[in-house]
Amino acid sequence: LKNGSVLRAHFAHVKLQHCPYHHEAESFEHLELKASLYDWASRESNTEVESYLADFQQIADLLVVDKNLALEVQCSSLSLERLKERSDAYRSHGYQVYWLLGKKLWLKERLTKLQAGFLYFSQNRGFHLWELDLTKKELRLQYLIHEDLRGRLHYQTEIFPFGQRSLLEVLRTPYLSQPMQQMAVELDRTFLTYIQQQLFYRHPKWMKLQEELYLQGHHLLELGLDFFYPLCRPIVSQNLLQIEEDVEGYYQKFMAYYQSQDIQPVQILYPPRFYAQQKS
């Protein structure tokens, strides 16, 4: 790479618009993040930018050649179908792929269907994803991602400044041996009022539950908070495109752990391996 932000961003090779395999306009953020990651990864590994993989006609933003590892810097929205197609193509040809998200795709208060497609899973960090921040020059691991029954996200953050550690070691963080993580979430004491509002506005999710309870001779508004406990739970989605392992056992052990306890003013959340260690 040449010095200077303009030439650096274009990687001192054929301009991308003239590349026969390049079809998408790239933002300044995307170009600069790729350049930063190239600088970081190439310190320890043979790394290529805009690497064309002829076997399945796909371009990797960055390819760590000796590790069969693709790094995709995603700064704009794409369809779930396209995300699945690209992710499956990498895996079926023996490549591991990490999707690293630009600013438009960072986690906010609620998880979108597309963001669910970028989630990874490990026994030590649970559901997690990776964010890139060009302004702060840092890679962020958002982990122990949970959702409460209002649909709001709760998660922890670990920050890795660009270039300070081995990039490959950083990306392995969720899978390395480590102390048990945890996260505290206060009990939502106004949740029953929220339920009342949802029924008033006839929200489909809560109307469906109310209908099921009605057939059993109950009503949502008769129930106490303990019926809904735990109020903060792991992500459940049909769009977990990066996760190949079966997480159903984790869901079951999670629910069994909290339902065996009295309702707590603060819910302490742990990674999957904690629940796996509990005796049933």
Positions of predicted regions on the chain:
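Catalytic cores of nucleic-acid endonucleases
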Residues: 75-130
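Conserved catalytic cores of phosphodiester-cleaving nucleases, focusing on short active-site segments
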Residues: 37, 62-79, 90
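A structured, charge-rich N-terminal accessory region that forms the first stable segment of a protein
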Residues: 1-9
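Non-catalytic C-terminal interaction segments of nucleic acid-processing enzymes
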Residues: 119-280
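Short, solvent-exposed loop/turn elements at beta->coil junctions and helix N-caps
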Residues: 49-58
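Short beta-strand micro-motifs in enzyme catalytic cores
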Residues: 9, 58-60
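Acidic-basic catalytic patches of nuclease active cores, encompassing PD-(D/E)XK
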Residues: 11-49, 65, 280
